[in-house]
Amino acid sequence: MPAFTQYLVIANVGIFLLQLAGGGGLVQWFALWPGDGSGLASLPLLTPWQLVTYSFLHGSLMHLAFNMFALWMFGTELERVWGARRVATAYFLSVVTGALMHLLVAGAFGGGRAPVVGASAGVFGLLLAYALVFPNRKIMLLFPPIPMPARVFVLLYVLLELYLGVTGTQSGVAHFAHLGGLIGGWWVYRFGRSGPRYRRG
């Protein structure tokens, strides 16, 4: 596994273990708190570090496992082509754009006082970048197990997230944070500079 992807997975797993060990304060201080920040009244409305730190926290083992699997799957391939710096830029920019999108939607439509945790926005940014770099690479769905080109997979996933976000069918998931993460991945694909050059085989 390339270095950045490996270190990022290790960091996420390590912080989740701290959460399990009783680090309830981690969520209070480092999750993304929209709305009036009612989870911790002494905090300001929004502290800047939350725009990044929320991505290192996870709500459950399944939440962590799914995100780390996707991070390994897409981040590994991208890092081999782009290099660590560009992948890191895409990931963390996606984390920030995902947070900003969630705050914008929560502020405009309300109902967004629950804290947001998880690496999903960063993963979505890498997923879009992966589909742009490898549009015809086949991705196998977990359920149902149907292979499809990466570009089709991303399009279907985006439409599903948009539907779930607008209708509120699946509560407890920050769908607009996921969608906002796409912006960071696209931006780095469009305007970022690659790391090591490579030849197509």
Region spans (language model):
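A detector for small-residue-rich transmembrane helices and their helix-helix packing motifs
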Residues: M1-G201
